[in-house]
């Protein structure tokens, strides 16, 4: 049954993708007062914190001090230290939900050749609430797992395409445009990723008319942003949103 639903959704996305790909994004978020603007965080481990994820079954990477899940060597122990919490607080936004999942990929190809479909961004994209703004830092694990780039493909996707980064990323953009036509979407590009993934992301975001914020100078501990790193991400995101 799930497979039939998947293909039905693909048909809908494929039908609308070509017509809407380069259409100007409706910027409803720009007219909503900041104190009532609803933000959804749609990310991977960089955007997690235990107890703040929806669904609650999503895996977290960041935990409070003293929790057995806390990773020694990374100094982030409070949700207030995360980049997304700082953005929401400083901008006066409201958190719609944080649907982030540690280790998640855009495509289905996971670490050690595992099937990451359950945690994939393409699987989770249908459950982002009713946001005015979506902030998504999303391709880090695709770059790290060894996932194949594949070809640029902007319509007529099939399930096999989801195992390749470029078509999977294109389908994600189409799904965001279709499901959240009135939301502003900002993709956030991590540092230290493979150049070919960064360039592919630039090309695909440009095709769909989605802005891409490229981070720089992000301090990391155990491969993840430290307190200083999260602060730097927050500052760069806030600077972009204020433009």
Predicted feature descriptions by range:
Residues 1-79, 89, 127-132, 181, ...:
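N-terminal secretory targeting modules
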Residues 43-45, 100, 191:
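A mature extracytoplasmic/lumenal domain signature
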Residues 32-33, 115-243:
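Alpha-helical cap/lid subdomain in secreted, periplasmic
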Residues 38, 95, 184:
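Residues at the starts of beta-strands that form the adenosine-phosphate
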Residues 55-154, 158:
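Conserved SGNH/GDSL esterase-like catalytic core that processes O-acyl groups on lipids
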């Amino acid at each position: 049954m799930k497979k039939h639903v998947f293909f039905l959704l693909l048909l809908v996305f494929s039908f609308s993708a070509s017509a809407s790909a380069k259409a100007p994004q409706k910027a409803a978020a720009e007219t909503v007062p900041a104190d009532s603007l609803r933000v959804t965080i749609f990310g991977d481990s960089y955007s997690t914190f235990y107890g703040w994820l929806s669904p609650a079954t999503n895996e977290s990477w960041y935990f409070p001090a003293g929790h057995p899940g806390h990773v020694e060597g990374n100094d982030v122990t409070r949700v207030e230290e995360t980049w997304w919490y700082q953005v929401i607080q400083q901008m006066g936004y409201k958190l719609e939900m944080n649907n982030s999942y540690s280790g998640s990929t855009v495509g289905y190809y996971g670490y050690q050749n595992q099937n990451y479909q359950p945690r994939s961004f393409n699987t989770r994209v249908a459950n982002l609430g009713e946001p005015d703004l979506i902030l998504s830092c999303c391709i880090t694990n695709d770059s790290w797992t060894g996932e194949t780039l594949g070809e640029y493909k902007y319509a007529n996707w099939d399930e096999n395409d989801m195992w390749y980064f470029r078509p999977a990323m294109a389908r994600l953009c189409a799904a965001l445009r279709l499901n959240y036509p009135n939301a502003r979407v900002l993709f956030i590009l991590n540092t230290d990723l493979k150049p070919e993934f960064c360039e592919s992301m630039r090309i695909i975001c440009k095709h769909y008319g989605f802005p891409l914020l490229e981070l720089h100078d992000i301090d990391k501990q155990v491969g993840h942003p430290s307190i200083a790193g999260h602060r730097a991400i927050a500052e760069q995101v806030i600077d972009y949103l204020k433009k």
